[in-house]
UniProtKB/Swiss-Prot annotation:
Pfam families: 3HCDH, 3HCDH_N. Belongs to the 3-hydroxyacyl-CoA dehydrogenase family. One of its GO terms (molecular function) is oxidoreductase activity. It comes from the Bacteria. InterPro entries: 3-OHacyl-CoA_DH (IPR022694), 3-OHacyl-CoA_DH_NAD-bd (IPR006176), 3HC_DH_C (IPR006108), 6-PGluconate_DH-like_C_sf (IPR008927), NAD(P)-bd_dom_sf (IPR036291). This is Probable 3-hydroxyacyl-CoA dehydrogenase. The lineage of its organism: Bacteria, Thermotogati, Deinococcota, Deinococci, Deinococcales.
Amino acid sequence: MKIKKAAVIGAGVMGAAIAAQLANAGIPVLLLDIVLPDKPDRNFLAKAGVERALKARPAAFMDNDRARLIEVGNLEDDLKKLKDVDWVLEAIIEKLDAKHDLWEKVEKVVKKTAIISSNSSGIPMHLQIEGRSEDFQRRFVGAHFFNPPRYLHLLEVIPTDKTDPQVVKDFSEFAEHTLGKGVVVANDVPGFVANRIGVYGIVRAMQHMEKYGLTPAEVDQLTGPALGRASSATFRTADLSGLDIISHVATDIGGVTPDDEDFTLTESFKNMVAGGILGDKSGSGFYKKTKDEKARPRFSTTCKPANTKTRARCACPPWTPRANLSPSATPCTPWKARKATSCAPP
């Protein structure tokens, strides 16, 4: 089958960005969200999602004119329009009851040939389709994108034991050839593949950061390009993903895998999430967005290894706890200074 038109339900950070990527591929997309009772515009959330995508940095659209391919609407007035789409993807809140309620409504209006998908980052797919018809279950397959979806190549495709293998094949080909994704077919287990590994790494990094008195920036200096990983490293990745998402995934995985890896969140992280410090989506996480849209550390660092050729590379180990560095400490000796000659802790 060919996917000529799609619908994304949920116009939050991920939903709007996925809609933008579909538009980038030339696919008309219907973007729906709930109606806010205190807003006169019933499509307020969907419109806000498109506006956010237009302002996103890095850019969500290849060309802002592509936004014209996105039709905005709401779940009360426009749900019936799902009868015209070939693929429905949900990107709503990570609560199983909410997904059950949504799929019950979607099944009543979606056409019988449409593929149905969830972008859930951790809720097992087989739990989402409980109570749905055999035909719905046959066409249901998880599609887990990563933020920002225009730039991150990976797409996890997660079938259940009810999913038609032909649906998996057709959808995977669409994702690879039309959306330009690198597809990994994952088992329908808590956290799938990437989050089972990645969120565990973030949680363990938090635990070690507090244990050894490190800062987020110091941890990122250790766990980014120095290890052959992306420059976003650990905590910039967490900010991009959304700290609330990290919290949900870690809690969900930890709750169903008590005999496996430790997914216990630190109290300081829980306090951040409870206080609305959620990463890029709230403007502040482990890093804080500045007016020029560049993320700056929210926490000071003790000794910054250079990231340009004109600065000294500090020989003072970045893992040295701040408590061990007094204001009168001997300045670090640079390894290969070109212009700078010292690297003293602040």
